[in-house]
Amino acid sequence: MLRNCLRKLGNHQTKCSVKTLHTPIYRTKNLQVLRDTLSGIKLLEKIITSSSYNKTLIYEPKYKSKPQVVSSHDTMRLHNVMRELLDSLQVDEATNTRLQSNRPRKLGRVGLQLFMDCIQDNLTATSTSLTCSLLEHYFKYPEKEVTNGIKAGLRYIRDFLAKNKIIVKSQNDVDALVEQLTMSSSDSQSIKRVLKAINYELFSDDIVRVINGNKTYDEVDVSKGWKYPAGILDSNEAYLRSLELPTKKLVSIDKDMLVLMYDGTLRDANKILPTITYARKLRKSILLIVNGDCTGDALTSVTINNNRNKRENNESRIVVLKYSKKANNDLAPQENLDFIKFLRLPCGYDSIYSPEYSPLVPSKMCADKYYGSIESIKATTGEAFLYNSIDAEAIPNKVPKSFLQNTVTLSIGGHNEIEIDRRRNAIDNCLNNVLCHGLAKGFIPGYGISLLKAIPGLNELKANEPNFMTKVGINAVLSAVILPSEVAFKNAYGYNYYEINSLIAGAINEKSFPMAKFSPNSEPVNTVKDGNLEPWSKMDSCLAGVETFIELLTSCNTIITCVYKKPERHKA
């Protein structure tokens, strides 16, 4: 009787219980948890290895119904595709309750997200293949000493590559390298024109912009001077129309301009009207840099002046730029001495007008106190280029040369959009992903050859290691470093298993760092002259990211995931 009552009570409690969300917690002592975490990266490895080295990837974008083709040379778009894949996995998990209880899928997404965060922009076949191979070896021997051996092997490779990186300096060598890196003579000629415009000083990826053009041929536009990190004030449509920005898309003034720096928010028209009158009579334009905002009556006066001068064929215009402290290394206008010197402000930081502290309002009467000058400006709402030539006699405090650079815009031409997109992606990758990093910090042989060159040193490191399990970790690195070359030779040349092994053995035995065989029946070639190079900094960052991810995954003992709430539908 009592047993039956308890059974009924238990059934009643079960029916009336409230279901609550739980937080899945996984212990990494269970190796299956780590294997599930690696599953997402294995999927990524299949995608990357099958679309690298002259291969292409077909995918359907998020907001397009037709499939798109991504070349292996277009690293930026390939990285965006992987980000879209990660986002789609996360959205599917949030909207599908069944997937929330699917442990392998959940852990695979977590592992993939951590890997992408660690590897950052160095998403290559090398990073994915090394990570998967090294962790598979660790799963066989999950010991801390094995992890130490893996880290020691990766650090040895990084040191080895740093000591042997190849510096390419002469213009002839750079031109020869460009010839090998490009797919057509038109691409190489355009890249050489860009390099010549900047005197072959391509040491940053923000010097050259590659965009789609609207003609059948390529155009090179050079913007000299200070690359200002903010564009024209875009908070007022009437002001933008007064500069004809909606139609011309660009404000370009190639004559001497007055410069006025204003510390604070400019609202009162009386603070700017004397300057407007002075500039209109001189028929000169004004560059107004505001540390704050320009609004109210002041902006209205500026707009009216621009429209009036346009009707009267007066060249005077007022271009308003906002000063961004964050974009100027957290320097206030008064602290940014290099910028003040560049603008040729007559009294240094004392020429910055402050309505609270300055005794005089800028005008013709005190022009020698407030107004600087620049020789030309090119500006949009996104950025601006200010130019002043450096003259040691005219400017006692000479501006450092590093603050004056040529910024080149290369507009890619073609007969159709597909051709333009393909050429833009290839040229952009060559300039801003390969050449800029390689010319700045050095090159190493590509196709995984540089990793093969480190194998003799890894063997010595392994032989001198007294701890057996640490040797196992170094041996895992020895097994993993040949994988990038296997993928490269298979995808790029279509070699079979025996030919690939022969080429790998030849590269290991060749003592000269830049020399390697790329055909089973040929002699070793110089990778510098042959153009088979990649930036050292990219490989170094890749190895550092792999090491960080492995250390992160093997050092934690708990993985805590979350259950996503289904998005709520808001009633209209």
UniProtKB/Swiss-Prot annotation:
Gene3D superfamilies according to UniProt: GroEL (3.50.7.10), GroEL-like equatorial domain (1.10.560.10), TCP-1-like chaperonin intermediate domain (3.30.260.10)
Subcellular location(s) of the protein: Mitochondrion inner membrane
Gene Ontology MF, one: ATP-dependent protein folding chaperone
Keywords linked to the UniProt accession: ATP-binding, Chaperone, Membrane, Mitochondrion, Mitochondrion inner membrane, Nucleotide-binding, Stress response, Transit peptide, Transmembrane, Transmembrane helix
Residue intervals annotated with topology Mitochondrial matrix: 17-471
Domain of life: Eukaryota
Presequence boundaries: 1-16
Membrane-traversing stretches: 472-488
Any Gene Ontology biological process: protein refolding
Coiled coil: none
UniProt cross-references to PANTHER family, sorted A to Z: 60 KDA HEAT SHOCK PROTEIN, MITOCHONDRIAL (PTHR45633)
Assembly description: Forms a high molecular mass protein complex of approximately 850 kDa.
Family indicated by similarity: Belongs to the chaperonin (HSP60) family.
General function of this protein: Chaperone. Required for the assembly of succinate dehydrogenase subunits. Ensures mitochondrial gene expression at elevated temperatures and prevents heat-aggregation of the ribosomal subunit VAR1.
Protein name: Mitochondrial chaperone TCM62
